[in-house]
Amino acid sequence: MPKKLLIKTWGCQMNEYDSSKMADLLNAANGFELTEVPEEADVLLLNTCSIREKAQEKVFHQLGRWKRLKEKKPDLVIGVGGCVATQEGDAIRKRAPYVDVIFGPQTLHRLPQMIKDSQSNHGPVMDISFPEVEKFDNLPEPRADGVTAFVSIMEGCSKYCTYCVVPYTRGEEVSRPIDDVLYEVAQLAEQGVREVNLLGQNVNAFRGPTHDGEMASFAELLRLVAAIDGIDRIRYTTSHPIEFTDDIIEVYTDTPELVNYLHLPVQSGSDRILTMMKRPHTVLEYKSKIRKLRKVRPDITMSSDFIVAFPGESDQDFQDTMKLIRDIDFDISYSFVFSPRPGTPAADYPCDISEKVKKERLYELQQQINTQAMRHARQMLNTEQRILVEGPSRKNIMELRGRTENNRIVNFEGSAELIGQFVDVNITDVFTNSLRGELVRTEAEMDLRVAMTPLEVMEKARKEDELGVGVYTP
C-alpha cells in the first residue's frame, strides 16, 4: 500500500510551486501519494509564509493540531518548510520538538534524505541554508496538472525593501540557466500545458546563464518561451518597477502570447513613503513606464500591491496613493495594512497611526479598486474574449470554465473536448467574481502561432555527456 503525503501550503505562488515540487520529489523517491486527509498521512508537511502578521503563531497552532495525530501515530513524520522555517527554525525546534524535519525554500530538494535521516536518527533534522541553484539541479521532471503551470525561473531578491523579509528568507537573486527553464517549459508543453506563469520574487530581474557563458535577459526569455509550440499564453509574477525596462516593453509589441495583463506592484503613491520603503523609483517614473507600455498595449489591465498605513504615512500620503490608483485605473489590488516583519528595518519605525485609521484607509482603497474592477468588467460586456478552457464550471458541472487574458473567469456552455483549448466567447453577463459568455469559435478556427515544437526545444537544450561536460546543439 503506497505511503500517503499531505502538504498544507500558505502564501504566494512560489510556495504553491515549491509544494508541487515536494510532492513530485517524494513521489519519485519514495512513491508517496497525496492525500487531503491528515489522519491518512504518513508525512505531514507545512509550507509556510512569513509575509503577514502573526505568521509564526499560525504555524504553531497548526503544529499543535498535528501533534495530537503524532501522539496516536508515533511514526508520523511532521515537517515545516518555507519562509517561517528559515526565520524561526531554532524556535520551532524548541517550541515544537516533535517536528521531525525543518527545511528552507532552497533546501526542499533534500527533503527525501532529510526524512530518511530523521527516521534513522530518531531526532529532528534541520537545513535552512541557501545553496544557490542546487535546488533546481535536483528536482524531478515536471508533471503537468491541467493546462496551466507555474515555472520558477529565479529565486530570492536583492532589493531589500525596508518592510520585506524575502531577502532574509529566500536569499539573494539567483537565476536559473535559460536552457533549463526552456527545457522545463517544453516538457510541460509536451504534456499539454498551454499557459505558463513564470515565477520569481523579482521575476523581471532574471539574468540567466546561457550555454555559451553569456547572460540572457528576461526579455529574451519571454520571446524564447513564446516560440515554443503549444505555449500560447505567458504570464509572470512578481515584477519590480525598477526592472521593468524598455526591452521588456518592446516584447509586448511583437509577442501575442504575452497576456494583456500586468501585475507591477507600486506599494504606495507617495514619493516620501516610497523612499522610506527603499523603493528606488518615484511615482512619476512608475507612471512613465505604464504610459510607455500602454502606447504598445492600449488595453492592458494593471494590478498592484499596496501597503496601507506604512509607519509615518500621513493623510496626504494616503491621498497620493488614491490618486495614483485612479490615474493608472488599476483593475485588481492586493492590499494590506502594514505588518511589521521581525528583522526588517521598517519593524523599528515608529508608527502613530490608530487602528481605526488603518482600517478606514484600507476600506477606502479597496472600495475604490472594487468600483474600478466592476467598471472594467462591465466594459467587457458584449465584447469577444479569447479564453483558455481550464475545466468544468465550479457552479455547474454541465458547463465549462475558462480564463480571459485579464484573469477573469468566464462560465459558458460547451462540450468537454474543449477543455485544454482556446475558444472565443461573447460576454453576455457580468457578475462580481465572474463573467458569462457564449461560444463564438473554437481553436480549430483560429490561427495560433507555431514556431518550435517542444521536442525541438528539448533536443536543443543543454545536456551533459558521459563525462558530465555540458554540451549544446545550436
Swiss-Prot record:
Its EC number is 2.8.4.3. Pfam families: Radical_SAM, TRAM, UPF0004. Residues 3-120 form the MTTase N-terminal domain. InterPro entries: Elp3/MiaA/NifB-like_rSAM (IPR006638), Methylthiotransferase (IPR005839), Methylthiotransferase_CS (IPR020612), Methylthiotransferase_N (IPR013848), Methylthiotransferase_N_sf (IPR038135), MiaB_methiolase (IPR006463), rSAM (IPR007197), rSAM_horseshoe (IPR023404). Residues 378-441 form the TRAM domain. Gene3D superfamilies: Methylthiotransferase, N-terminal domain, tm_1862 like domain. The keyword Zinc does not apply. Monomer. This is tRNA-2-methylthio-N(6)-dimethylallyladenosine synthase. It comes from Photobacterium profundum (strain SS9).
